[in-house]
């Protein structure tokens, strides 16, 4: 391991204090685009809601959800153009449904897939037991008389969307050319619509949802309570879960709404949590994706990193300055890239980086370069040009970042404080945290001696 003695924690080097305006200039440039982005989103959403209202008029089993304002909030935060999910509620009495978890789910696959059975003793569910969305059970001993079939529900919803779009265009309820349904195809778990709003095009994925009371154990964990406003986890848990199509026969728990509520809760706390997320999302779009939005980190990846960073750094002073806030997310992100594992925030056994198409080695190099020398990515105007500063880290940092892969106990505040100090942004005066961080240094120093 690099280093032979623990230096005094670096509060702020003089040249870093000079950099602070650079971070704020970059943030202000992002924020200047927020209002137009929100207006574009609201226009696009209005077009989509007009279509969905017609869907409901054609088939009252499908309900327009007007209660969700979190997508607009997130759309304003980010610079990336990832598709947005829009949920269409199934107006079924969810208490009359039984979640039958599949035994075939592999460990680490995240939320279990399940079937949704209609209980035999349930009454008033005749609209949900028609052949277009329902499959009769062949087993007499089952508690259920049959199941809601995702592929059938999606097929009905797709046909309704097509009919609704035709109606809205014919009656001029939506602007000409504002909605493209070319990707609305059979067999998809999400129904994709491209909506034009001014010069911006926003892709929405329409998803049928069954909302049901169901425990999410992670929301009851003591660790999460440290980083969030008091009582918020209990209120979020009371919402229940959203079940969305996983495949033709099975549903799965969607955590999108729960995670968005957690992100929104962070925005109510003082500090730069959401500002730093906006900065990293912009840097990701401009510098880390290598010109492609299809095979890089997504806003959801970065959102998960912030949620973990908020539990690892729960103190208000961790988020008091903008640069330090960015680096609290960066050290978590770098660790996840180095170990090739980003745990799902509510289902930590599920690795969000295991999906195909991500060149984690290349992404790591870009993120590490930014963390070591962020200036070139932050300069947005010729007046921001200045002399290049030396790298903040040495070549041995990747070995340190991989420690949690072999010893999960490193996934703790003291370890990440140690990494912050390596990047010269540990600006905490708490004696207990300094002592714990120095203990981590001594531990890594001992490991380095044993391996040499």
From Swiss-Prot:
One Pfam family matching this protein: Mab-21_C
Name of protein: Protein mab-21-like 4
Cystines in this chain: none
Gene transcribed to yield this protein: Mab21l4
Record InterPro entries: Mab-21_HhH/H2TH-like (IPR046906), MAB21L/cGLR (IPR024810)
Organism per entry: Mus musculus
Superkingdom of origin: Eukaryota
